């Protein structure tokens, strides 16, 4: 069980909302994707062809920022309306799709882009599962 799942399970308030396991999986996927996108951007900066990776770097950094914010808000189960959560998760889903597509375009040349695309795709799947419960 992840720390996110432990925190949901041990929260002192009986909060209604999305399924705890689905929520924990989305939180974990968001934070994993944020870290992976940050590392991918840094790896792109280390490549000789860094100028050609400029768009990828920017997309990685945008995705990392949105995933981090989404994971943080989902972790705070303090009265957010479903509409706000849905909008945030939809934004996360959109940037993760965009980043996965961008990184897939470089995956054959740069292993770090393949890894990043996979993390983004896992986050997309987790966000889709969470949206189905909201």
Language model feature labels by segment:
Residues 1-134:
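Amphipathic alpha-helical hairpins
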């Amino acid at each position: 069980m992840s720390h996110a799942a432990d925190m949901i399970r041990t929260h002192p308030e009986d909060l209604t909302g999305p399924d705890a396991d689905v929520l924990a999986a989305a939180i974990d996927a968001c934070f994993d994707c944020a870290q992976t996108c940050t590392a991918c951007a840094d790896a792109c900066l280390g490549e000789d062809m860094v100028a050609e990776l400029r768009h990828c770097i920017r997309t990685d950094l945008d995705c990392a920022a949105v995933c981090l914010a989404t994971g943080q808000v989902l972790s705070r189960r303090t009265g957010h309306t479903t509409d706000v959560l849905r909008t945030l998760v939809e934004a996360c889903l959109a940037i993760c799709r965009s980043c996965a597509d961008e990184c897939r375009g470089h995956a054959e040349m740069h292993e770090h882009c393949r890894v990043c695309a996979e993390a983004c795709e896992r986050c997309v799947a987790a966000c889709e599962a969470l949206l189905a419960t909201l």
